[in-house]
């Protein structure tokens, strides 16, 4: 071995000796200081529920008595949450243990990670479930862009399709996007315009919609949307579901007091015979002080949308629609437990003597607007709904919400606001999400006046 190698070896050994010696000194000092600090601490006090291991028995802690009443009041809610989340947690444990998600993602995603195929499914009580596939692509239209195609089937009479394209990159202050939708269902629900009735019926819809928008974000908190839309919607008698007859047997034309089956009365169901064919332009403003919209965040949210629609073909209607929303999320504990309060309202204003098509009227009874009632069961010229919702985390990327709604439907310009009945519903929902999109949600809601239990579950691709 050369002299230079011996010198280098000796120098390395000496440096190693210094490191080991220094580490031993530091460890010894920490042990001494730790022993001194422990010697200065008073012994555990059993009267305060303290133990020698430093823990405090919750049952013996003074705060335990104060929490007894809230725990008792929340016991039914906690039990319901546990019942709903139990299968989800069991499934989550199985998925995590066997790496099911990673395997499925790898099998349905291209090697670049920006394109892939995902399953989608939706189910709501009293409606046919749908299932299909969604293709997503964040590469073809350019870096940060989005291309999505969705197709779902229920049966031969239920079909949904969607094609969405956003060529602009995420994060730009100006965004543009296009969307094409196709919907064919024969189990749509209608029970009249005005207060919910017992004359429940089903109708079929065959609709094609083309939508485009330009979105400006001058600041992080403010967004401005300019949108255009054209649609063709055709209606027909539906399939008897849950004992609800086709619409032509319920809201029919009467001659000499007798119902003429399969001929829908246009006075009771405006636009059914002509269809809803329109061109629409919209302007929307959104103010959102929350950092992100889906994860629990405190802040203020306000929105205003005004659109104008003009019919074509057999649809001669012309009308404005106005939507407003105000909400606030209050931080109850560590930014993860929130109380969300919001009020939202819709109204339409016809500009001629042609009634607004029934399908374009404001409705309540939807996943995000009084889900305790049949979808579209509360319908009129204007609607107003107030919601109180409590949200809290239950698992990584998942949260639960307990909500109560109070709302109603009214005639033009809310003219009968004081005299019309309002409706209550309560519900519980579990949501699995990313920072910007729901992956899966499941919930149960109950409509107090005239409604019933409504169960919904759904999932889609990111």
Question: Could you say what each language-model-derived stretch is?
Answer:
Residues 38-118, 252, 270-273:
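N-terminal targeting leaders of membrane proteins
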Residues 97, 114-119, 136, 246-406, ...:
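C-terminal outer-membrane beta-barrel translocator/porin domains of Gram-negative envelope proteins
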Residues 387-389, 415, 425-430:
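Short glycine-rich, acidic/polar surface loops and turns
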């Amino acid at each position: 071995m050369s002299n230079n190698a011996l010198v280098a070896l000796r120098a390395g050994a000496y440096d190693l000796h210094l490191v080991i010696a220094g580490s031993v000194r530091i460890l010894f000092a920490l042990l001494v200081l730790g022993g001194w600090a422990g010697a200065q601490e008073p012994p555990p006090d059993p009267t305060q529920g303290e133990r020698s291991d430093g823990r405090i028995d919750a049952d013996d802690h003074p705060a335990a008595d104060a929490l007894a009443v809230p725990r008792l009041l929340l016991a039914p809610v906690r039990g319901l949450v546990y019942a709903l989340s139990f299968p989800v947690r069991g499934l989550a444990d199985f998925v995590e243990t066997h790496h099911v998600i990673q395997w499925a993602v790898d099998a349905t995603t291209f090697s670049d990670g920006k394109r892939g195929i995902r399953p989608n499914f939706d189910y709501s009580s009293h409606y046919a479930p749908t299932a299909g596939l969604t293709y997503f692509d964040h590469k073809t239209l350019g870096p940060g862009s989005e291309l999505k195609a969705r197709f779902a089937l229920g049966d031969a009479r239920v079909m949904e399709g969607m094609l969405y394209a956003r060529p602009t990159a995420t994060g730009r202050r100006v965004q543009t996007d296009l969307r094409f939708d196709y919907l064919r269902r024969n189990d749509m629900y209608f029970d009249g315009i005005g207060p919910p009735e017992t004359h429940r019926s089903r109708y079929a819809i065959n609709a094609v919609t083309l939508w485009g928008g330009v979105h400006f974000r001058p600041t992080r908190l403010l967004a401005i949307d300019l949108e255009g839309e054209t649609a063709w919607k055709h209606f027909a008698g539906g399939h008897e579901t849950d004992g609800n007859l086709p619409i032509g047997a319920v809201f029919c034309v009467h001659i000499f007091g007798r119902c003429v089956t399969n001929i829908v009365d246009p006075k009771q169901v405006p636009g059914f015979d002509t269809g809803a064919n329109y061109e629409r332009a919209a302007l929307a403003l959104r103010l959102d002080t929350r950092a992100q919209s889906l994860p629990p965040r405190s802040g203020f949210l306000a929105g205003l949308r005004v659109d104008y629609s003009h019919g074509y073909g057999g649809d001669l209607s012309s009308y404005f629609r106005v939507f407003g929303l105000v909400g606030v999320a209050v931080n109850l504990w560590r930014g993860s437990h929130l109380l969300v309060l919001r009020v939202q309202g819709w109204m339409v204003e016809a500009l001629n003597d042609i009634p607004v098509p029934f399908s374009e009227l404001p409705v309540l009874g939807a996943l995000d607007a009084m889900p305790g009632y049949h979808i579209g069961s509360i319908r009129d010229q204007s609607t107003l709904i107030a919601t109180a919702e409590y949200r809290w985390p239950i698992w990584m990327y998942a949260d639960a919400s307990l909500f109560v709604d109070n709302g109603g439907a009214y005639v033009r310009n809310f003219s009968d606001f004081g005299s019309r009945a309002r409706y209550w519903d309560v519900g519980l929902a579990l949501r699995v999400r990313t920072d910007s999109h729901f992956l899966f949600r499941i919930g149960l809601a109950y409509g107090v006046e005239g409604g019933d239990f409504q169960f919904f579950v759904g999932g889609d691709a990111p």
